[in-house]
Regions:
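Catalytic, metal-anchored helix/loop core of enzyme active sites in primary metabolism
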Residues: 1-391
Length: 391
């Protein structure tokens, strides 16, 4: 039985992960037990989860919300931690042996490193951790003998396709698929008056707001491009991206003999979540089966980098390397937050991200502080450029 610490339990990935645990337990299997839960501030849902799954400990990032939760669950035998220290404390619990990090943003970096240093099996859905601190994360994982299990559908697909590979030198390239988001096929002139509500209408996937906006700008695929470089130790030139509107083929690998292997399934995040939690075993899933006869055709297109400029910015950032991916990620997080508040336009996101990718200096990443400082400077630039104060 794997004993799970779930960071980000009230978010999109977190709630789906708990659906997976329910399904596995309903099937009579006891492969996963929820040992710890963490959330940012949604203590109403977190309390419900605590009463259902009975974890040993929980953490709330927002300090005031943590105090309220302590009062709400004083009748239960559960320890309530708070802040960044609380998130990290959960990953070090002796009773925990696997951590699923599904928090959104740079806040996920320190808990990931702490979990790896504690030699916990690590399932990562927090792509910003690898984008900003990929060299640190992979170095720490290697030093502690930990294999990182990807939860993003595309990276899970690549991970599954690689099972049974004889030698890494047999691999020619990996091919990530992108849905294209809600604005596929549109040009820049058609995207001048996009509102948050428009960008939040994803055609295939049920995701949180930030990730859905990133999908609409193709920033999500740029982040996944960087993530793939670190997860699979690939050069940027050996990673391709194709737009696949149906979201049935989740990603592919090509071998030296030009044979191609793909992972297919209906677009449901519970498949990659479950595989990460139960790896290397597989269990019955709550997800419906894929019936290929229902699909008359599957389509593939080259991404439009001229219109969706964030994607190219990410590729340029990882080629320059160092702290620049952290800066680009920080700029995007700040810009998306402003867009969701309708303080800037949808197209402003790409302009801000590209400016950081093309003009910011880069430096070697030697510590968490290097990553956090690059992130801070990029966020400060975005806020200053948009007339906002850092708060």
């Amino acid at each position: 039985m794997k004993k799970l610490a779930l960071l980000g339990s009230t978010g999109s990935i977190g709630t789906q992960a708990l659906d997976v645990v329910r399904c596995i337990q309903k099937e009579g299997e006891h492969a996963v037990k929820v040992e710890a839960l963490a959330a940012h501030s949604n203590i109403r849902l977190l309390e419900e989860q605590i009463r259902e799954f009975k974890p040993q400990a929980v953490a709330v990032f927002a300090l005031e919300a943590a105090s309220k939760l302590r009062a709400a669950v004083r009748d239960l035998d559960v320890k309530v931690y708070s802040g960044m220290e609380g998130l990290c404390a959960l990953t070090e619990l002796e009773s925990v042996d696997i951590v699923l990090n599904s928090v959104v943003g740079m806040v996920g970096l320190k808990p990931t490193l702490t979990a790896l240093e504690a030699k916990k099996q690590m399932a990562i859905a927090n792509k910003e951790t690898l984008v900003a601190g990929g060299s640190l994360v992979m170095k720490t994982a290697k030093e502690n003998g930990i294999e990182i299990l990807p939860v993003d559908s595309e990276h899970s697909a690549i991970f599954q396709c690689l099972q049974g590979m004889y030698k890494k030198c047999d691999l020619n390239k990996i091919i990530l698929t992108a849905s294209g988001g809600p604005f596929f096929g549109k040009k820049a002139g058609e995207l001048q008056h996009i509102r948050p509500a428009d960008a939040l209408k994803h055609p295939n996937w049920d995701m949180g707001a930030k990730v859905t906006i990133d999908s609409s700008t193709l920033m999500n695929k740029g982040l996944e491009f960087i993530e793939a470089k670190w997860l699979f130790d690939m050069e940027p030139d050996d990673i391709d991206v194709v737009v696949h509107r149906e979201s049935i083929v989740h990603s592919l690998i090509e071998y030296k003999d030009h044979s191609v292997i793909a992972q297919l399934g209906v677009p449901d995040m519970r498949i990659p979540i479950q595989y990460a939690l139960t790896y290397p075993r597989r269990f019955p899933s709550p997800v419906k089966q894929l019936n290929l006869a229902d699909w008359q055709k599957l389509t593939f297109y080259a991404p439009d980098e001229e219109t969706f400029t964030c994607f190219g910015a990410c590729k340029r950032a990882i080629r320059r390397g160092g702290t620049l991916p952290a800066a680009v990620n920080g700029a995007n997080e700040a810009a998306v937050a402003l867009f969701l508040k309708e303080k800037i336009s949808w197209q402003d996101i790409g302009e801000l991200v590209c400016h950081v990718a093309d003009t910011f200096e880069t430096a070697p990443v030697t510590s968490v502080e290097d990553v956090l400082e690059a992130d801070r400077k990029a966020r400060a630039y975005v806020l200053e450029r948009c007339g906002e104060s850092a708060r």
